């Protein structure tokens, strides 16, 4: 959170401001904070509270996660429907969808993936995040957002929501910012759909902020057939490289 926010502020100091923002899972709070929905202090506090609530839920309802590779999303969804407690949770990019759910059912699910000519890679995580196992955490986080302790504002820069892959404040969607952000905890992250929507709307430069290049990796598959640029900022070196790529001296 802090590295990504610092990277965004560093770009802003050089005159680089986004036309839209999106964050993956926890990163959505960072995107909303930078966009003015929360102060920086509030953003940090929300990240901490969210983590505590999700950890409590994971301890109460243990879960497992696995990345499914080399299968269409629709086929993975169909496989999930054959299990009572396995759900698609992270739509990352074509050919990669993360699932989560009951640890007792996961081995058989992974065998079903392999039988369908896909690949299943168990993930070393402590819970079934973005599933109904997180319902109590989601409800508690909504209460925190609505009880008046935090100033919740509509973002000044457009932000795309993980739950809907649509903008916060979309007139076609009736959910408030607090409802969308809290519901994200127990619903899938629709990253692939967000990126596809941005590309369809004409966005052609994407800058990943924070440690690592995971989203950039997803982006390489998502921008195929598009004239689009993928950049990232995680330290001074990558900041300078990104500024150079943007023509900022």
Regions found by a protein language model. Give the residues of each.
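Alpha/beta catalytic cores of group-transfer enzymes, especially the acyltransferase/condensing modules
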Residues: 34-179, 183-184
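A short, acidic, amphipathic alpha-helical segment used as a generic capping/interface helix at domain edges
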Residues: 186-203
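Short Gly/Pro-enriched loop/turn and capping motifs at secondary-structure junctions
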Residues: 165-166, 188, 212-215
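Short glycine-rich catalytic loops that host catalytic nucleophiles or stabilize transition states
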Residues: 124-126, 199, 233-235
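FabD-like malonyl-/acyl-CoA
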Residues: 1-75, 120, 205-237, 243, ...
